[in-house]
């Protein structure tokens, strides 16, 4: 074996002051891992301090006390000693006493054990402790003050000491610490296990307090660490460590049938033999690796010590990772198939509000169109390119083209669950939901709606249709819609009169078109122009599907035409449109938007009233929670009430146009919700 030259053992063989002086003078020339020889007086002082702390058990138990014993009686019994703590448990008839030091504890045991107290024979003994730890793999140069500072960081300690060699007086690389509470000891064990200290990692394990005896604290086992990872020759290892003394146990660490431990345990018959081998063989080279020999915790045989070290190494590896594995990018992308996540991502698209956006895109747009989400995914993709996931996951994250499939999957999810559970007002059929979740070219919005429907006069906030179609195509649309501002056929002078107000009306209804796209009487095939033909109210299949819905409040009167939008009660927004009298005895009109545009073109007061009407229009969620009975009462009140006269008159309208009259009646009323 190749041994280190000038080891600590050789340095310690010298005697007298000259040896200590020579050791101190040679200290700068010492190689790494070597320590200077100590003066014999220093060696004696260290050993004396170690033995004093070893026997410094100052907590005692006084058992078999009378049932009515008090703490005052225990103080009087032990009046010759300095008590630091005293507690009497009357149920157990036991007193827990802490004295000044271990010497007083030993004296009290010898004096009061089997002492007769009020007719009872007392039993006095040392308190057992379950907060004792042994810390191994400490640096040889670690001082007692450094060790105390290390362990005191985790709680109040009862005592701590290092184990020194009886020959050289140097530390053996392990020590003991007893905490006041077991919680402190458990925390220290968890934190110190695997902590790097110098060139090695610390080990912390529980110890039996009965092993704290001068003849038992010196270990007989050595840990051979930093072996080659592929080293598996136990016979060669046994031969290497049998040159000075033959070991009684030598085995490589085998974890679950593999030689992946990288260390071994060797046990000798005496602690002196183990110390001699450690001084000579520490730092030898095996298969090109310089191994490290350190003392194991004393008390246990070599086989048990090996099992404890394997378990400790497994615990160190498990502490470096979380309880759950980290998800890879592929799993993150697959999570988008979850319907709950789709609902969150598409929530602004399904229930957009006419509110001024604070950050990101307009509230009528989906979160998937927000630049923050794609940029975050791309940033995360770049961070994961060097991981073990591979190039496939990076390409998946960088390619956002599959994202349009999210809305299609959401539609399938909604259609699969349609009409499963009838609500208070019945569930809308799938034919009604499809227009609300239409996938197609986006609506070219002109303005951005502010708070309460205020129109901010900005143009072309949304890119052209081709751009948004490439950007997932998530917006609702009108089928075959003409570009905004383009006149329909037959407008003539009416179009010229309304040219000043069309831009305002477009701004006011840009956010409302999302909600009015399924209103009856609204032209579905063209823009909001005057002479468009009113299409049929509703296909027969939709009416049949609507009649099949069950409602706890029964069917509404036939005179009231309800909206086909499942989330919006039209009677609360524009009640005159729902009345059958609005369409009786007159030729077909141009629809809701045309009537409102005509009203706007007549004057600023009507325009102000219209803006108030739109401003008081709540969002979809508010109407989804409103009571249907309350809405029916409102509809019946509109049926009975007649149009009220007022200062606002509609110029250029026919007297028989009762639909416009009902619209003006509603615009004048101030509703309080």
Swiss-Prot record:
InterPro entries: Nucleotide-bd_a/b_plait_sf, RAVER2_RRM1, RAVER2_RRM2, RAVER2_RRM3, RBD_domain_sf, RRM_dom. Its main location: nucleus. It comes from the Eukaryota. The keyword Oxidoreductase does not apply. Residues 18-29, 499-512 have a biased composition (Low complexity). May bind single-stranded nucleic acids. Interacts with PTBP1 and RAVER1. This is Ribonucleoprotein PTB-binding 2. It comes from Mus musculus.
